[in-house]
């Protein structure tokens, strides 16, 4: 999924995951797109600081 596809899916309230179902991709209450590992709450931004480059490969993001 591209960044635009991920953001659209989240806006449509779809469950987006990265790599496996343990990594949830979502938008927080202040508008940041994040990836959180559910088991330990470790969280990173969806993108690098430039806001364009994904923290992961496009093919590893999917809708659950």
Which residues are covered by each model-predicted region?
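Short, surface-exposed beta-strand/loop "edge" segments at domain boundaries and coil↔beta transitions
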Residues: 23-26, 40-47
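N-terminal acidic leader/helix
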Residues: 2-26
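Intrinsically disordered, low-complexity segments enriched in glycine/proline and serine/threonine
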Residues: 8-10, 30, 52, 61-62
